């Protein structure tokens, strides 16, 4: 049985992922809340890796709000989400995690991005 850590496991996507994984092959799911670990801080992330000992990490956690709050504090949202990813990826490397999956948000793409979006497409309209 593999030990999995799902960051953001108690959010919308995380709850659905937990339900899917629970119906599949046996895995041990760990989904601690953000109050336990500040994923923007290297010390907290290291402490989490040591305590949870995950073999697989699914990174779904993000600082989110709504369109209004995102527009009021774009740098804060960008910074905190970036730091979570950086700290978790480095922690995974340092703790020899077998598999790391990070999920992004549509908020990271330009305002007028065609759907479906292709990484080869570029836009000068970045919000």
Task: Indicate residue ranges for each PLM-predicted region.
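Catalytic helix-loop patch of NAD(P)-dependent Rossmann-fold dehydrogenases
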Residues: 72-90, 94, 98-99, 107-127
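SDR active-site strand-loop-helix element
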Residues: 7, 32, 57-63, 100-106
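Active-site loop signature of alpha/beta-hydrolase-fold enzymes
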Residues: 12, 37, 42, 63-69, ...
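Adenosine-cofactor binding site in Rossmann-like domains, unifying the SAM/SAH pocket
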Residues: 22-48
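N-terminal Rossmann NAD(P)H-binding glycine-rich loop of SDR-like oxidoreductase domains
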Residues: 1-22
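NAD(P)H-binding glycine-rich loop region in Rossmannoid oxidoreductase-like domains
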Residues: 43-82, 94
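Short, well-ordered alpha-helices that flank and scaffold nucleotide-derived cofactor binding pockets
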Residues: 15, 19-23, 50, 62, ...
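Short acidic/polar active-site loop segments enriched in Thr and Asp
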Residues: 27, 55, 98
């Amino acid at each position: 049985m593999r030990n999995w850590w799902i960051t953001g496991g108690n959010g919308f996507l995380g709850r659905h992922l937990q339900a899917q994984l629970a119906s599949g092959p046996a895995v041990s799911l760990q989904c601690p809340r953000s109050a336990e670990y500040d994923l923007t801080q290297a010390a907290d992330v290291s402490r989490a890796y040591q305590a949870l000992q995950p073999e697989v990490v699914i990174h779904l956690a993000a600082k989110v709000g709504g369109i209004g709050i995102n527009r009021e504090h774009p740098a804060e949202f960008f910074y905190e989400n970036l730091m979570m990813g950086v700290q978790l990826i480095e922690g995974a490397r340092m703790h020899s995690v077998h598999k790391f999956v990070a999920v992004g948000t549509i908020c990271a793409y330009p305002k007028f991005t065609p759907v479906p979006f292709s990484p080869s497409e570029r836009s000068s309209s970045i919000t």
